[in-house]
């Protein structure tokens, strides 16, 4: 029975993806206001919060290279200790331009701090940016905490951004985000929650801006229909809650120039999601660039696609964060 059930579930997901039936779209009205018992699930709840508080601690040096020094860091986020790393460029006079790199999904219990993110972070540091990577709540080395609609991850990023803005060696008007896969989802949410704090954003193979579409993909494609939603809302009963948690319904709030990259052969996150997000941002009159690649979900380091991704990202950050 299980294989048949899984096949049926995948068929339903395919039909929903192709037809758009039952999915919240940018042109749909946002659902009526309702209570958010978590205080962190809905875009409106996240926008009403304050961010920051505490200090970024450089725990120890992880690596010395000719171009940058890498530090293990930790910082507070809603009472949680979050681990990460910071690449401080050499040969660049502060105050620094900053890029925060948000990683995609890896089993939180086994997330290795360095391998996933260093190819992007190191290239950005060599280009003269101070680069910071948070590992998020619940991941190896960080405290666990609530995370409905993955909003906890966005809170961790925005608390970090608020702390970075207070650093004397950082330009508070030159902070960018670079998000891959799930980190792209985290980034999109940050753009509608604190648009005034983010001055350029790069999305690479990003998960969607629609919480319902994301749940459908995770539940049916990866979890075989057994995905347990983290939070008090039911995907079956609380569709209005999913609408209120979806950045796609708040794109009018975006103030940040956005650059989007996606591989045409991506079998993890639908290529169409990035194309559709580009269209939606353009419909709202936002500044957006979109690049398609003959590549899969993660571009191999040193490949033509990876090299173009990093060249375009660095040029984009240079243009919008200054030299």
Language model regions located:
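Conserved alpha/beta-hydrolase "acid-adjacent" motif
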Residues: 267-273
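N-terminal cap/lid segment of alpha/beta-hydrolase-fold proteins
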Residues: 48-93
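Hydrolase active-site cap/lid region
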Residues: 188-238, 302
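C-terminal catalytic histidine-bearing segment of alpha/beta-hydrolase fold enzymes
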Residues: 275-323
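Short beta-strand/loop motif that positions the catalytic acidic residue
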Residues: 254, 260-262, 266
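Short substrate-entry loop that stabilizes the transition state in hydrolases
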Residues: 92-96, 101-143, 210-211
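Alpha/beta-hydrolase fold nucleophile elbow
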Residues: 170-181
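Alpha/beta-hydrolase active-site loop
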Residues: 148-168
């Amino acid at each position: 029975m299980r294989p048949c059930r899984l096949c049926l579930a995948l068929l339903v997901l395919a039909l929903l993806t192709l037809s758009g039936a039952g999915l919240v779209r940018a042109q749909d009205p946002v659902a009526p206001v309702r209570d958010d018992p978590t205080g962190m699930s809905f875009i409106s709840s996240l926008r009403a919060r304050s961010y920051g508080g505490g200090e970024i601690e450089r725990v120890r040096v992880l690596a010395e290279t000719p171009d940058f020094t890498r530090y293990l860091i930790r910082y507070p986020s809603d009472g949680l200790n979050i681990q990460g790393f910071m690449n401080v460029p050499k040969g660049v006079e502060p105050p620094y331009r900053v890029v925060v790199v948000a990683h995609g999904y890896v089993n939180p219990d086994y997330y290795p701090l360095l391998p996933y993110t260093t190819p992007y972070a190191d290239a950005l540091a060599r280009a003269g940016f101070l680069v910071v990577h948070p590992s998020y709540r619940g991941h190896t080395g960080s405290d666990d905490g609530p995370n409905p609609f993955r909003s906890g991850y966005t809170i961790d990023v925005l608390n970090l951004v608020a702390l970075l803005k207070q650093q004397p060696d950082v330009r508070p008007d030159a902070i960018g985000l670079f998000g891959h896969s799930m980190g792209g989802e985290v980034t999109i949410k940050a753009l509608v929650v604190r648009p005034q704090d983010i001055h350029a954003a790069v999305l690479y193979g990003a998960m969607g801006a629609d919480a319902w579409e994301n749940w459908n993909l995770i539940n049916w494609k990866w979890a075989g229909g057994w995905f347990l939603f983290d939070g008090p809302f039911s995907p079956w009963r609380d569709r209005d809650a999913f609408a209120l948690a979806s950045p796609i319904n708040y794109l009018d709030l975006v103030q940040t120039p956005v650059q989007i990259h996606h591989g045409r052969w991506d079998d993890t996150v639908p290529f169409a999601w990035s194309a559709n997000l580009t269209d939606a941002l353009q419909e709202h009159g936002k500044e957006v660039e979109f690049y398609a690649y003959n590549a899969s979900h993660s571009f191999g380091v040193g490949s033509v696609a990876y090299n173009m991704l990093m060249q375009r990202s660095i040029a984009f950050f240079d243009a919008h964060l200054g030299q």
